């Protein structure tokens, strides 16, 4: 759900949702799915972006396009809601799928644009955020339970103190550098900023349903209020 486009306003909002509003719910969800792990916090990995081979003039142009998605419910639901055809492709097969024309574009973490050489197999990367990347920090539950309450607090608090400077700032700096490099390689007009207002209105019902189905009725409204 956290990767769904326009679920959160930005990375700071997404972190607040995960570490405050839904912290207990996320702990319960992790415990249910991964009984050996304890959820601690999130690190902001930066926004996801859309990449396409052909230029979009608006998000309406996504209708009918085959867009790569990971096996993440929020990403798939968002693409379906705007009329795209999400195609689940593992990350290690993504470059080849784009190269061979299996898909028309992709959604993935923006800061991978240069390191993974996606400029070679797509032309356009849009500056609009298309979901927020959050790296979940977890710990072996046995190791966690062996710590005192004070030690547990120190572990979480230390991570949260270091994350803004040692992790998130680096992702913000990298985004500016990466977009500049993309334009250098693919052309000055290859990182458009689209008007997202219509897409946000289209996406809202799907994102609201997803949030309320997973975390209970009224969750989406609470998220928008913080």
Language model regions located:
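N-terminal secretory/targeting leader peptides
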Residues: 1-13, 32-226
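A gly/proline- and charged-residue-enriched helix-loop-helix capping module
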Residues: 9-31
């Amino acid at each position: 759900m956290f990767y769904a486009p326009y679920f959160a306003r930005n990375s700071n909002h997404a972190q607040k949702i995960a570490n405050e509003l839904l912290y207990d719910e996320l702990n319960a969800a992790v415990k249910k799915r991964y009984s050996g792990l304890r959820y601690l916090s999130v690190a902001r990995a930066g926004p996801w972006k859309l990449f396409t081979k052909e230029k979009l003039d608006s998000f309406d142009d996504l209708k009918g396009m085959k867009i790569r998605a990971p096996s993440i419910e929020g990403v798939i639901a968002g693409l379906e809601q705007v009329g795209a055809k999400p195609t689940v492709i593992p990350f290690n097969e993504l470059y080849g799928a784009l190269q061979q024309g299996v898909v028309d574009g992709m959604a993935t973490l923006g800061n991978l644009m240069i390191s993974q050489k996606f400029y070679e197999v797509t032309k356009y990367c849009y500056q609009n955020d298309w979901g927020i990347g959050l790296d979940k920090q977890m710990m072996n539950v046995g190791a966690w339970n062996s710590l005192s309450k004070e030690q547990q607090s120190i572990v979480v608090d230390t991570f949260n103190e270091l994350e803004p400077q040692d992790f998130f700032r680096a992702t913000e700096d990298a985004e500016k550098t990466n977009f500049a490099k993309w334009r250098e390689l693919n052309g000055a007009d290859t990182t458009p900023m689209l008007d997202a207002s219509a897409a946000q209105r289209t996406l809202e019902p799907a994102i609201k349903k997803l949030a309320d189905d997973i975390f209970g009725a009224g969750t989406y409204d609470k998220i928008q209020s913080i």
